[in-house]
Amino acid sequence: MLQGIEAHGDVALTPQLFAEFQLDYVRGTLKAVNEPLPRIPPLRTGVGLRWQRNALQAGGHVRFVATQDRIFSTETKTEDYRLLRLFASYSFGDSNMTHTITGRLDNATNELYRNHLSLIKDLAPEAGRNFRLLYNVRF
């Protein structure tokens, strides 16, 4: 049996400043033996701020991931962690096509963490601090 909740919201603090939040949680149980289902993610929450003025955006987001210790018999516990993402973007184009260039710094604090859903979490942690330059076209 699976039970869960997911929520996401944005709030305009000013015409140019927005706060966002997200939360998701799943609980899975194999009812026949009353044991936790495998590969169920832990509770995850996040908060962020985004500034936007015309074609420019910048902001940050912190994601909090709880310890996962409600585990299937063959799994190992995964410790909690926090991730900081910073970004800035610029958009241009017209009503037919919009181009967006984004610079994004993921795991800005270089946190050592393991994703509970990773099949190799016991062998290798997730990526440390990394930068991405993204180009997106919408048409």
What spans do the regions from the language model cover?
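Short sequence motifs at beta-strands and strand-loop junctions characteristic
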Residues: M1, R39-P42, T78-R82, P125-A127
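Gram-negative outer-membrane beta-barrel transporters
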Residues: M1-Q68, T109-L112
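Residues on the lipid-exposed face of transmembrane beta-strands in outer-membrane beta-barrel proteins
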Residues: A7-V11, V47-W51, G60, L86-Y90, ...
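Outer-membrane beta-barrel domain signature
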Residues: H8, A32-P38, S73-K77, I120-A124
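A generic signature of intrinsically disordered, low-complexity regions enriched in glycine/proline
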Residues: D10, T14, G28, S73, ...
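C-terminal beta-signal and adjacent terminal beta-strands/loops
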Residues: A19, Y90-F139
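Short, glycine/charged-rich beta-strand-loop motifs at protein surfaces that mediate ligand recognition
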Residues: I71-T78, R85-S89, H99
